Amino acid sequence: MIMTHCNRFIMLFALLLLSFTAAAHPIEEIETEATDTTILVDGVQVTAVKQGMVLRSEPIASTIVGERAVSRNQISALKNLAEMVPNLHIPDYGSRMTSSIYVRGLGARIDQPVMGMTIDNVPLMQKNAFDMELSDIERVEVLRGPQSTLYGRNTMGGVVNIYTLSPFHYEGARLQLGYSTGNTFRLRASFYEQFNDKWATSVSAYRTTSDGFFKNELTGADTDWEKSDGGRWKLLYRNNKGLRIENTLSFAETKQGGYPYAFLGGRSEGVTNADGYAVTPGQIAYNDSCRYERLTLSDGLTIQYETERYSLTSITSYQFTDDDMHLDNDFTPLDYFTLQQKIKEHVVTEDVIFRSKGDRRYHYLFGLYGFYRDQQMEAPVVFKPAGIDAMIFAAANQATGGRVQMHALANMPLDSEFDSPAYGFAAYHESSLRFGKFEAKAGVRIEHEQVSLDTHGSGTLKYALKVGAMPFPMEQEPVVLETESSYKQDFTEILPKLSLIYRFDENRNLYASFSRGFKAGGFNTQIYSDVLKEMLQAQAMGGAYEEKDIMSYDPEYSWNYELGGHFSCAEGAIRGDFALFMIDCRDQQLTVLADASATGRMMTNAGRTRSLGGEVAMQFKPWRALDIDLSYGYTEATFRHYIDGENDYRGNYVPFAPRHTLSAGLTWTIPTGVKWLGDVVLHGGMKGVGKIYWNEANTVSQPFYTTFNASVRLEHKNYSLDFWGENLSDTEADIFYFESIGNRFVQRGRPRVLGITLSINIQ
């Protein structure tokens, strides 16, 4: 099977190589214009301070989405962008807290992300804040493959660089109003002003409200409602001596429901609650509230000094996150247990980059990076009497054959408090040497990180005991638990990379690269309530708690081998990128249940996985008015060695990572000839993803499925009016699946969505 796929990739690679030859014999010249599609943006744009001037001439698999493409495709969040990028999958489930990212077979549901994210060169350190509203975006760069040498921790799958609009590039005011299915309303407003050739500023704000798409059938309430507000203030300075200063202050507040998980079946099926409501497959029905609230505040200061020979850049940031999650953690009408998780986090980062400039054979880059994080978390879990009897006492009562019966008398609160400071620092370097049409690059990063965890747990269990022929249960002395513990982990990593690129010309090249990726280890705070529960249970039954080594997990490593290229032919009418890759991943981090009775998730390390795959992104412009975009990614990510203590999963597919991603779009621009009307832009597209396995045993899966979208846009330099639709085929698909306390749950994808968006530019 693997050899068959490899042969297909070799054939694809050979066909793509022919495009380089075809460029020597172009077809009839076609008038083209520089467009900001997913392949190419205006050549004057400058990429991140750590990359080259033009990403398509670098040995990197990348996708660039410009301002016009962001607007035309209604991209308002990172998960919308992922649908345009091959081998990138960001499912929209749970709430904005669940920012799970999967790329090239790598990814995880909780804790450390596999991809990094920067906004105006400032790294986002809290994964919970990745899913945010994107407004006034100038362009987005998605770099795939390990970027650990330049970007460090948690970028082994790549990095997403987002750049917001600069008041030096645009002056005026913007207003956007949108309404769509689900009673979803969006309002955005911004103002850009350049005072003189040195100073400029911008202010922007947004508000989003939505009733959502799913209802709780028990209460009749909307489950995935949302209210979000935010704003950004940028102040820029530049002089004619090479100095540039940019400060960006931003905040965002989100309040939402979320977690529309439907019960599929399991041990609770048919069980009725105190009101006689039965747990029924296919229903979203839970009795306690599920909601999420988040407040973020960040300030990023970039100071850059440039000469003809070098540039020196300092990027300093402060980030504050305060979020609060509430869950009916059994997701049923039964009174079992609830969870709250509150996180307050302060982060300070500093990155200093010194790099050479100019047209020279040898270039260099040196960097120093450091961060400090102070995080406090509270995670109280409350087990209710019905939940205690069903989840804790049931097995013990059954084991005695009914001779001894234990029953809960009151709620059992399990309070967990965590203090988790962390710090890290790194030094990195990259050298490049050009000889003829070849350019070789070599880089290395030395990174050290230390993370600590201090825990405090407490709980109280009140119960009654009935033995034999006793006429009634007797209340027992409450079991009281108070415990503290401390953990610490240190990581010191050396992250090298090598690449060689051959440039046929400025638009066509081939490259080969080799690099090491790294994802930090950490602590399993979500499983801590299970530890407390088992401690209380052991005390109540007169036994001893057997401590398990489950509170921490190790870093994840990968060796990445990649062969790819960028091409352009037929006078620029055909442009594209392609890559073949193999990723040998060691200690891959997987989200699992500790055992069948566990209520929380934990991260564990699989022995070894391997990802083989390829991806291609192309743009065709047969004539000026027509654009055709196509991207496809294939990944075969399998376990090479993973035994969970009972089962050997060798050869099985890694769960949650799709095997195929597909995106295709056609845009036709029709000039109306009416000055005040502008152009009519017709767009149609298709997106596909799958097959996705939901567990390590590969017994549950979502087949490959497609959704269709379309829009009609009136586009003028001063305004645009969009009539758009997503999932027009109303495709039903599962986007998330999980099992908990013997039950199975799923979240379906959104139904058909229709909307209208009005944008106004006043210049």
Name every feature range the model reports, one short phrase each.
Residues 215-221, 259-285, 330-337, 380-415, ...:
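Solvent-exposed loop segments that connect transmembrane elements
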Residues 99, 126, 135-138, 149-217, ...:
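Outer-membrane beta-barrel translocator/receptor signature
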Residues 302-327, 509-515, 526, 532-605, ...:
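Membrane-embedded beta-barrel scaffold of Gram-negative outer-membrane proteins
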Residues 169-170, 178, 190-288, 321-335, ...:
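Periplasmic-side early beta-strands and strand-to-turn transitions of outer-membrane beta-barrels
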Residues 365, 437, 573-585, 602-695, ...:
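Gram-negative outer-membrane beta-barrel transporters
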Residues 687-695, 713-763:
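C-terminal beta-signal and adjacent terminal beta-strands/loops
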Residues 62, 79-122, 138:
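Extracytoplasmic beta-strand/coil segments of soluble accessory domains associated
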